[in-house]
């Protein structure tokens, strides 16, 4: 299906992943989001998409069969213009008007009600558990790629496309935020699905605070801000193969979660700490977080 079938309406934004347009499907009248990214020419006879791109798109199309309510739908993929070096691929997603950043900013003081936060978190974790069960690590969760529909449905976006996006990102001089990155990513250690649960913890705290939890300006500065809250981890938990030694950071103990998220009750603080656990092998999974008592009890002291 050709990308020209869709009529661009407005530019939504420009990011590390390229330019995003809101467009209209004239056949259905529905709005869609168009993301055009460049991928390297596969180099086979006559060119073509790289095998890695074909595999990633095939996996995402398979996920469509499940129609998970908390995952943005990939409706179409079109390879359009090409050169000797690269091919422009247009990804057609369902269009959602706002992201979590906008949703939080629009909430009147003092912010979102606790029960709304719990509902958002249950949906967020449900979508993420679905991705993890299908062996997809998001790797870049942040409020800007968690979308919220007008009726409060959470949908995860920009997942499963890491290899497709990597070429475009190398061409785009956009600073990728470190604020939601797990320690193992900051240390350039090996990583898997637990990296996403660290990001979930940062976003969970931000729903209460209405501002990011850790705002570092370099990998080392980000780690320092993390250790200011959770304490310097023990030597046994420090990954062996990284260039930044544990000794580069001053010893310090943990602080109470309520010192940075005073509105959070004790069981919520306990869940947050299970997400913000330094050792990824000890970090709570999306599946286990969904079972946590905090997300299933009414707020006892709700105002």
UniProtKB/Swiss-Prot annotation:
The modification Phosphoserine is found at residue 300. GO terms for biological process: cell division; cellular response to interleukin-4; cellular response to ionomycin; cellular response to lipopolysaccharide; cellular response to phorbol 13-acetate 12-myristate; G1/S transition of mitotic cell cycle; positive regulation of fibroblast proliferation; positive regulation of G2/M transition of mitotic cell cycle. The active site is at residue 140. This is Cyclin-dependent kinase 4. GO terms for cellular component: bicellular tight junction; chromatin; cyclin D1-CDK4 complex; cyclin D2-CDK4 complex; cyclin D3-CDK4 complex; cyclin-dependent protein kinase holoenzyme complex; cytosol; nuclear membrane. It is found in: Cytoplasm; Nucleus; Nucleus membrane. The keyword Membrane applies.
């Amino acid at each position: 299906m050709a990308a020209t079938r869709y009529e661009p309406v407005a530019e939504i934004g420009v990011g590390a992943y390229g330019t995003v347009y809101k467009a209209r499907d004239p056949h259905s009248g529905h709005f869609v989001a168009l993301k055009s990214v460049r991928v390297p020419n596969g180099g086979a006879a006559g060119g073509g998409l790289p095998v890695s791109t074909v595999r990633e798109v095939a996996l995402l199309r398979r996920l469509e069969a499940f129609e998970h309510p908390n995952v943005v739908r990939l409706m179409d993929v079109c390879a359009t213009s090409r050169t000797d070096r690269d091919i422009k691929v247009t990804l057609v997603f369902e269009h959602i008007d706002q992201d979590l950043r906008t949703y939080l900013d629009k909430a009147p003081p003092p912010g979102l009600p606790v029960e709304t936060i719990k509902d958002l978190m249950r949906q967020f974790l449900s979508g993420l558990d679905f991705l993890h069960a299908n062996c997809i690590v998001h790797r870049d969760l942040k409020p800007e790629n968690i979308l919220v529909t007008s009726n409060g449905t959470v949908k995860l976006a920009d997942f499963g496309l890491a290899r497709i996006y990597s070429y475009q990102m190398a061409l785009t001089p956009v600073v990728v935020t470190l604020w939601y990155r797990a320690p193992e990513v900051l240390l350039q250690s090996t990583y898997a699905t637990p990296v996403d649960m660290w990001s979930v913890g940062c976003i969970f705290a931000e729903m209460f605070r209405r501002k990011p939890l850790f705002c570092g300006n370099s990998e080392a500065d980000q780690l320092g801000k993390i250790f200011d809250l959770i304490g310097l981890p023990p030597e046994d938990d420090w990954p062996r193969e990284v260039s930044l030694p544990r000794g580069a950071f001053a010893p310090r103990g943990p602080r109470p979660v309520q010192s940075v998220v005073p509105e959070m009750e004790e069981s919520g603080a306990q869940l947050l700490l299970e997400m913000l656990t330094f050792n990824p092998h000890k970090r709570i999974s999306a599946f286990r977080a969904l079972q946590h008592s905090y997300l299933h009890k009414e707020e006892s002291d709700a105002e």
